[in-house]
Amino acid sequence: MKKQVTIYTDGACSGNPGPGGWGALLMFGSITREVSGSSPATTNNRMELGAAIEALALLKEPCLVDLYSDSSYLVNAINNGWLQRWQRNSWQTAAKKSVENIDLWQKLIKLLKVHEVRFHKVKGHSDNAYNNRCDQLAREAIKKTS
């Protein structure tokens, strides 16, 4: 039976594009792990995707994951079938434009083949303590880039 893991993620950018950071909480039973990272020049969406990728990549075996994010971009791409359509359409949007962040989407796809992940949208900057902690981690990571 797969381990059940809960992950909260958030990405932030000071300017968009600009210096960015991401934060994640991984929870398994009574264990909670906090991770974060940054990039000197990036976008908010790249940090949102990066947070999910980095968190999932830390899992040492296939897991059943509930991943919570305040990123509509990330959650809708998965839950509304955008990601599947983009792949079928040679990474073109419905408007026939190139999908942004293909490199990160491809990394995420590989991880989604390993783990069974359910994506959940949470309201950002509200009363969700886990999401707020991820936001704090992301913002602290940005400070380390300057």
UniProtKB/Swiss-Prot annotation:
Domain RNase H type-1 per the UniProt entry, residue ranges: 1-143
Catalytic activity: Endonucleolytic cleavage to 5'-phosphomonoester
Record localization: Cytoplasm
Entry-linked InterPro entries: RNase_H, RNaseH-like_sf, RNaseH_domain, RNaseH_sf, RNaseHI
Pfam families documented for this protein: RNase_H (PF00075)
This protein's UniProt keywords: Cytoplasm, Endonuclease, Hydrolase, Magnesium, Metal-binding, Nuclease
Cofactor comment: Binds 1 Mg(2+) ion per subunit. May bind a second metal ion at a regulatory site, or after substrate binding.
EC number(s) stated in the UniProt entry for this protein: 3.1.26.4
Gene3D superfamilies the UniProt entry points to: Ribonuclease H-like superfamily/Ribonuclease H (3.30.420.10)
Biological function: Endonuclease that specifically degrades the RNA of RNA-DNA hybrids.
Database matches in NCBIfam families: PRK00203.1 (NF001236)
Protein name listed in UniProt: Ribonuclease H
Protein source organism: Chlorobium chlorochromatii (strain CaD3)
Gene that specifies this protein: rnhA
